[in-house]
Amino acid sequence: MKRILLPLEDTERSLKAIHYVKKHYPPEDAELVLMMVDESLGYSVKSEAENQALKELDEKLETIAQSLEDYKVNTVSAVGKAGVRIARTARETGSNVIVMTKSSKEDMLSSIGTTAEYVINNAPCDVVIVSEAANSKNEYRGLVYR
């Protein structure tokens, strides 16, 4: 069984990674680890603001997990630099593959972004970057780095 790490954010683009996983990995062959990272707080000592941010991320992840009822789903919320947290979580969870989208910034549409680049260079497993563009059959195309 493959353990798939899905780093998500609050964008519709991010949900394409979920569609990719549903299409390519049947529930009986995959265990999903949904992850969200709040980069706004940085690395600080545990504070009330961090606890509140983690609580909000957990609520969002739970909502997304409910839409994946056929899959075994675990959730991870974190505060800090997204790329670092994603690579660390992949190691800690024993993930076999990370499926993520490229940059969510509108001015970075032709680039994969710094977070994806960091993950590709530091992940202990394969990384699939799901393309935003769909081909003529509305199938997602992606790249596998390793």
Which role does the model predict for each range below?
Residues 1-16, 122-146:
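Intrinsically disordered or low-complexity boundary/linker segments at protein termini
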Residues 1-47, 51:
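Small/aliphatic-rich secondary-structure junction motif
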Residues 47-62:
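Short, surface-exposed alpha-helical segments at coil->helix boundaries
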Residues 100-122, 132, 136-138:
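Glycine-rich, Arg-bearing micro-motifs that act as flexible, cationic patches
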Residues 66-98, 104-106, 137, 143-146:
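Structural beta-alpha unit
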Residues 17, 44-50, 87-88, 110-111, ...:
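Short, well-ordered secondary-structure micro-motifs
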Residues 33-35, 74-78, 128-130:
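General small-molecule cofactor/ligand-binding pocket signal
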